[in-house]
Amino acid sequence: MADVREWRMHDVVDADGKKIGTLESVYVDTATDEPSFGTVTVGLPTRHRLVFVPLDGALVGPSYLKVAYPKSQVKDAPAIDTDAVLPAEEEPAVFAHYELPYTPGAGGERRLARR
């Protein structure tokens, strides 16, 4: 996968090409420093929020990032305010939403770090 950190502010679409929102930031796995989740801006212009989507299996297109999860699942994902960072205690819920295994980082530290 190309460096998805370069694709901030590009459209995020699902496997069917349906636009989900705009890639706002990338969270890396603290154990590998590899991109793990992206946050996508969704909602009405006056009520934007950021939802999390796994980047595993994502494909980069000319002006978009195609993720492997349906729009409906991404829109229902755990969300944070546009100026917030995911609290460590909420990380397990993000993984659980996508039925992904969660293990804390080394020494019980957080698993995801915003880049």
Listing of model-derived features with the role each one plays in the protein:
Residues M1-R115:
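Peripheral interaction segments used for macromolecular assembly
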